[in-house]
Swiss-Prot record:
Family: Belongs to the aspartate/glutamate racemases family.
A single MF term (Gene Ontology): glutamate racemase activity
Name of protein: Glutamate racemase
Residues at which substrate binds: 9-10, 41-42, 74-75, 184-185
Source organism of the structure: Shewanella baltica (strain OS195)
Entry keywords, A to Z: Cell shape, Cell wall biogenesis/degradation, Isomerase, Peptidoglycan synthesis
Pathway: Cell wall biogenesis; peptidoglycan biosynthesis
Length: 274
């Protein structure tokens, strides 16, 4: 196994980001770490979140010799990123809600941000809106329940569309033409969201932008050279190595099946004391 790209989230949402990165670097090795024992992150105190994430990620970086960390979680990106960068010597990439491209795309200049309550209320989010969407009317919608609905869909294949419609009623009423998916879990239920909101609302997430940033940083660190070598070897030998790590006591059969379908050959529980 070559030095992997480590993608980190509280749950399965980061798989949407991982999929975008793999489009750009299909032959790289990947580790996916999801801290599902402490899901959802938006309900944790900040210092508890920081301490747990730093310990968990730094331990796995040391174990796997990862060359870059992608924090594929909006809540962790706004809270934990500085501490991770202070404790790691490798690049750390975070998630930024796609406020800027949403404002540029909107014709009506009525856009929305659908995220967890923590992301919605943070000063960083409001700075993004002031900087990049000052010519737009921006509606903010905070909902943790959607995170658990996405997790439930992956675990069971089921989605309560009536409940989803109830949760999205304020979004429908706002008459937006662009909605930013400000949580990496939400692209996992994008089809269902689109069904409720209708074709008149464009959904935007940050996955492609994160993938582009990863490629840029690997190039700047001269690690893209290693990736080109790995790519040549993998084209000759076959599939890249995919490892998944989780923190909960156990995971559902449905989630295990999803991870296998995504290409993970190793699915392992790791323990955390935080």
């Amino acid at each position: 196994m070559s030095r992997p790209i480590l993608v980190f989230d509280s749950g399965i949402g980061g798989l949407s980001v991982l999929a975008e990165i793999r489009k750009s670097l299909p032959h790289s090795d990947y580790c996916y770490l999801f801290d599902n024992a402490r899901l959802p992150y938006g309900e944790l105190e900040e210092q508890v979140l920081i301490a747990g994430c730093v310990a968990l990620v730094c331990d796995l970086v040391a174990r796997t010799n990862a060359m870059i960390v992608v924090v594929a979680c909006n809540t962790a990106s706004t809270v934990v990123l500085p501490a991770l960068r202070a404790n790691l010597s490798i690049p750390v990439v975070g998630v930024v809600p796609a406020i800027k491209p949403a404002a540029q795309m909107s014709k009506s200049k009525r856009i929305g941000l659908l995220a967890t309550p923590g992301t919605v209320k943070r000063h960083y989010t409001h700075e993004l809106i002031s900087q990049f969407a000052d010519d737009c009317h921006v509606e903010l919608f905070g909902c943790s329940e959607l995170v658990m609905m996405a997790e439930q869909k992956i675990a069971t294949g089921e989605m309560d569309m009536h409940r989803l419609a109830d949760l999205l009623a304020p979004v429908v009423a706002a008459q937006l033409d662009v909605l930013v998916l400000g949580c990496t879990h939400f692209p996992m239920i994008q089809a269902e969201l689109q069904q409720v909101l209708g074709a008149g609302v464009t959904l935007m997430d940050s996955g492609a932008a994160i993938a582009k940033r990863v490629v840029t940083l690997l190039t700047q660190q001269n690690l893209i050279v290693e990736q080109r070598r790995v790519t040549n070897e993998r084209e000759a030998l076959g599939q890249s190595v995919m490892q998944a790590f989780y923190t909960k006591a156990e995971i559902s059969e449905g989630l295990t099946t999803t991870l296998i379908d995504c290409g993970f050959s190793t699915i392992e529980r790791i323990t955390t004391t935080n």
